[in-house]
Amino acid sequence: MNALYIHAQKQKTQLQQDIAKFEQDNLTAPISLQGSISATLVAFEKTIEQYKQHFDKRRAGGSNDEEQLDPKYELRLVSLKKDHKDFDAKFKELKQKYNENNARSKLFESPLDAQTGGESVMNQRRTATNDHTSQPGNTSSNYGLPMYDGLQKEQSIFQRGNAQLDMILEMGQQSLDDIMEQNQILLKVQDQMSRSLRTLGVSEETIQTINKRVFKDKLIFILIIFLFLVGVYYVLKWFR
């Protein structure tokens, strides 16, 4: 649960930064920023749902120590839900404002601008490129905008790919943390079981047999971690 909460905090920080940027440059913010915020909101909601499922399981069948921790986890869950609700409402408000400004800009666009493809809100985002292509002696002015659009699309594809890769890596890190936590639990259970068997008078030979079996399981566990790290390496190598 701690790993999920840390993951949710990272998503929360990302949302705070992106929404603040969208609010600051609402008129000229790129469309890709809205897509990034939408994707992070969906991922944040999914993380909260996973956290809630773990919380419900722990509260339903937890020990006394876990029950004492329930208030802390419940407060975290309530806080995360409130944050998601606030982010979602703020994003909808900014999107509505963006659409209204964009529509107003097109409404008051002069006929001459409409015929010559004058600057709209979208073209303002390409000011630097338009200035370059409109300089005297620049023979590629008729092809500047299509080339820029192609570069923008390619950059947007790379950004989405990097965002998906980061999400995969975060999920892998979360899975690795869960596996390490489960390994620690298994080690504690093994120690408790060995002490219990000795207390019950079970022979050392039987205990050694059990420990050998546990050791084999541990080797399998280490092999799985190794294969996981190799997989992450090849994913990074493939995408980058």
Swiss-Prot record:
<feature type="transmembrane region" description="Helical; Anchor for type IV membrane protein">
    <location>
        <begin position="219"/>
        <end position="239"/>
    </location>
</feature>
<dbReference type="GO" id="GO:0031201">
    <property type="term" value="C:SNARE complex"/>
</dbReference>
<keyword id="KW-0472">Membrane</keyword>
<dbReference type="GO" id="GO:0005789">
    <property type="term" value="C:endoplasmic reticulum membrane"/>
</dbReference>
<keyword id="KW-1133">Transmembrane helix</keyword>
<keyword id="KW-0813">Transport</keyword>
<comment type="function">
    <text>SNARE required for protein transport between the ER and the Golgi complex.</text>
</comment>
<dbReference type="InterPro" id="IPR056173">
    <property type="entry name" value="Sec20_C"/>
</dbReference>
<dbReference type="GO" id="GO:0012507">
    <property type="term" value="C:ER to Golgi transport vesicle membrane"/>
</dbReference>
<keyword id="KW-0931">ER-Golgi transport</keyword>
<feature type="topological domain" description="Cytoplasmic">
    <location>
        <begin position="1"/>
        <end position="218"/>
    </location>
</feature>
<comment type="similarity">
    <text>Belongs to the BOS1 family.</text>
</comment>
<keyword id="KW-0256">Endoplasmic reticulum</keyword>
<dbReference type="GO" id="GO:0006886">
    <property type="term" value="P:intracellular protein transport"/>
</dbReference>
<dbReference type="Pfam" id="PF03908">
    <property type="entry name" value="Sec20"/>
</dbReference>
<keyword id="KW-0333">Golgi apparatus</keyword>
<dbReference type="GO" id="GO:0000139">
    <property type="term" value="C:Golgi membrane"/>
</dbReference>
<dbReference type="InterPro" id="IPR027027">
    <property type="entry name" value="GOSR2/Membrin/Bos1"/>
</dbReference>
<keyword id="KW-0812">Transmembrane</keyword>
<protein>
    <recommendedName>
        <fullName>Protein transport protein BOS1</fullName>
    </recommendedName>
</protein>
<keyword id="KW-0653">Protein transport</keyword>
<dbReference type="GO" id="GO:0048280">
    <property type="term" value="P:vesicle fusion with Golgi apparatus"/>
</dbReference>
<dbReference type="GO" id="GO:0006888">
    <property type="term" value="P:endoplasmic reticulum to Golgi vesicle-mediated transport"/>
</dbReference>
<feature type="topological domain" description="Vesicular">
    <location>
        <position position="240"/>
    </location>
</feature>
<dbReference type="GO" id="GO:0031902">
    <property type="term" value="C:late endosome membrane"/>
</dbReference>
<dbReference type="GO" id="GO:0000149">
    <property type="term" value="F:SNARE binding"/>
</dbReference>
<dbReference type="GO" id="GO:0005484">
    <property type="term" value="F:SNAP receptor activity"/>
</dbReference>
